[in-house]
Amino acid sequence: MRIMGEFGTMNALIIATVAGGLLIDQHWALYGQVAVSALAWIVFAALWMRSGRERRPALAACLLIATAGEAFLSLVWGVYAYRLGNIPLFVPPGHVLLFFLGTQIAERLPARSEWVVAALALPLVGLLAWNGRDTLGPLLYALFLACLWLSPSRRLYATMFVLSLAMELYGTWLGNWVWVPQVPWLGLTATNPPLAAGAFYCVLDLLVVSLTARQLASPGLNPSVASHHAATCKARSSLR
């Protein structure tokens, strides 16, 4: 609760930046993307300044990995495209802001909620694949399950799976970006957006958590790792 209180204003600012920024980018064609990019980097800088030294490696790792991932997915693989055919400068810091917001939400989720998310998503993914509208979905869903299996930070991945889907639905509805109906290289189909698109965000977070596991023992960034770390310390103390 202390962490939520400390960053409550930042969380609200992140939500406003994402929701308002995408709206401005779409409807203020001349300078909207420039204005939103400047805003996103300012909010990122504010988050960086307010974060302690233990949190900053995760924010930096998220920024670098997200930038590389965006370049590959949109420019090389071409599974989606932004409205101007570029990677907007607000996208890399936007990933960091969404990642941080996800960690704050994940901290408040009850135990095993990740499996509830997985169970609710499964029939929808299966239905869209069965009718041929989103045959990419099962592959992405398997990627999501792999993230749940590979790391103890399961609540974070479940949070990002849902949070990113909400953002994807909003962004594609506005027209900020569009997913291609035929997935290059794989010959699969995809809805706009794919229901399990959040799996890409989960992979990003898995890489961030894996690279900065020691720093992420802070409860503000990785509640699952923090709980595991605290339980281990308590067990060791009881044996002394």
Model regions and ranges:
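Aromatic-rich, lipid-facing transmembrane alpha helices and their immediate juxtamembrane interface loops
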Residues: M1-R240
